[in-house]
């Protein structure tokens, strides 16, 4: 069996929930982190991590690094000793912004380790390990597989369904210059929910799937509403209602919190991209908040491996 000594794994950012699909729907976006793993059997140390990118100084360079923890987790799963490794990280996905940066690290570490170990695990097995590490599937599944994915199941029994995404639906992300941790965003959620709120989301979840597939503007506008998590989280994001109103006025189908936030995701028609981008950026500018606003596409490849 041929073992590669160097492998590069490119993993897309993801946007999770898309309104009513709390903890079960996510889509891969054309924004990436890149991880290069090089075995160094003669090195003096077991681990060397180099990070480049605008937030490189915030990424751990030791064994606490999530990427390395995922990397070693796969070897532990195989009952093998991890190799001495040099890891080069190129950051393109903002940290703690609701765009699945942790999922890129988990998928990157697992896929990189699997490649260097000789591909002993299937994609499905890697996915199960990733879900177990992350605790929920909505980011790691599309990060691994690409496209928009619905994940249903528990423990090691998962059914994954790709949701078709109509070409007339363009994601626009507004990434503010402040952070919101997933832990903080989950802490504000209630312990119990009413039947009415559950039914509200069940109905819109079904409509969301059909709206994404068909591109029906009216359906999409109604389907992006939610009562399970967004009403409790939007207070953590300064300017949420103002940015949302501005996006809708500019022609967006709807706007939601991307993952746990604070990034806001608008979906719009291709002809409205510029007006929606401008409206969302101007709204936050009026509140003296700097935001990176850009349109993206749906990534269809997922984690991409290049051995060299």
Swiss-Prot record:
GO terms, molecular function: ATP binding; homoserine kinase activity
Pfam families, A to Z: GHMP_kinases_C, GHMP_kinases_N
Gene3D superfamilies: 3.30.230.10, GHMP kinase, C-terminal domain
Listed pathway(s): Amino-acid biosynthesis; L-threonine biosynthesis; L-threonine from L-aspartate: step 4/5
Domain of life: Bacteria
Location(s) in or outside the cell: Cytoplasm
Binding site for ATP: 94-104
Record field: catalytic activity: L-homoserine + ATP = O-phospho-L-homoserine + ADP + H(+)
One Gene Ontology biological process: threonine biosynthetic process
Cellular component annotations (GO), alphabetically ordered: cytoplasm
Annotated EC: 2.7.1.39
Keyword line: Amino-acid biosynthesis, ATP-binding, Cytoplasm, Kinase, Nucleotide-binding, Threonine biosynthesis, Transferase
Family recorded in the similarity comment: Belongs to the GHMP kinase family. Homoserine kinase subfamily.
Function: Catalyzes the ATP-dependent phosphorylation of L-homoserine to L-homoserine phosphate.
The name this protein goes by in its record: Homoserine kinase
Organism: Crocosphaera subtropica (strain ATCC 51142 / BH68) (Cyanothece sp. (strain ATCC 51142))
